[in-house]
């Protein structure tokens, strides 16, 4: 059974938009970098995020993606947004919530866990999205066997199987009318 369905919605995670406390490793890294080196590193991270966003737009199958209704972000190992490039900012901010959910429920879960090569998909607004037409993918990144960050993209797709065309069902009478609603699940 997939852990998302076993754990269900986690309202505590949904409310954790503030940054998590710094880890000892983050504090040591912060103390060892001067302002100039930090700005150079920050600029490099900004460029990585911008290239991720532009690549996502070029690969887009939906018109909204090609027009820039996308976000690409790099998140800390705790799920906090570190840097992003976006056409619609709320995608990047809200993508913290599924990442924090993944960290809380799966990082040490023996049957799922987090491993190099994993990928997690989600689009359910109850797990941090805006609406089900906004679909996200987050991938944990490891260095020397240690989780160091997540990278992720959130995109707006036009169709997601709702009872009305266009991805947003204004006349929905139940959540099933809205189409595909997927909690954070491991797909790779």
Q: Which residues make up each language-model segment?
A:
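Long, charge-dense accessory insertions within large macromolecular proteins
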Residues: 2-101
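Solvent-exposed alpha-helices and their adjacent loops that cap or buttress functional pockets
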Residues: 64-67, 111-114, 130-132, 144, ...
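General beta-strand structural signal in soluble alpha/beta enzymes
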Residues: 74, 83-85, 112-115, 121-123, ...
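A charged amphipathic helix-loop-strand protein-protein interaction module that recurs
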Residues: 90-125
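Short, Lys/Arg- and Gly-enriched loop/turn segments at beta-strand edges
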Residues: 128-134, 159-161
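A short, hydrophobic, proline-anchored segment that marks a local hinge/packing element in signaling
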Residues: 134-144, 152
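Mobile "lid/hinge" segments at catalytic clefts and subdomain interfaces of large enzymes
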Residues: 147-188
């Amino acid at each position: 059974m997939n852990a998302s369905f076993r754990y269900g919605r986690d309202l505590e995670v949904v409310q954790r938009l503030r940054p998590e406390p710094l880890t000892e490793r983050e504090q040591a890294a912060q103390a060892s970098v001067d302002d100039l080196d930090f700005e150079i590193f920050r600029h490099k991270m900004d460029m990585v995020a911008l290239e991720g966003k532009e690549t996502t737009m070029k690969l887009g199958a939906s018109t909204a993606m090609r027009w820039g209704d996308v976000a690409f972000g790099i998140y800390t190992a705790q799920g906090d947004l570190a840097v992003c490039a976006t056409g619609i900012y709320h995608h990047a901010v809200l993508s913290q919530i599924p990442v924090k959910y993944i960290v809380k429920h799966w990082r040490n879960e023996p049957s799922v866990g987090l491993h190099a090569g994993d990928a997690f998909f989600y689009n359910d607004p109850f797990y941090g999205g805006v609406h089900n037409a906004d679909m996200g993918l987050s991938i944990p990144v490891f260095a020397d066997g240690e989780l160091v960050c997540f990278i992720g993209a959130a995109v707006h797709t036009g169709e997601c199987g709702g009872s009305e065309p266009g991805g947003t069902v204004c006349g929905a009478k139940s959540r099933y009318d809205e189409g595909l609603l997927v909690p954070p699940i491991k797909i790779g």
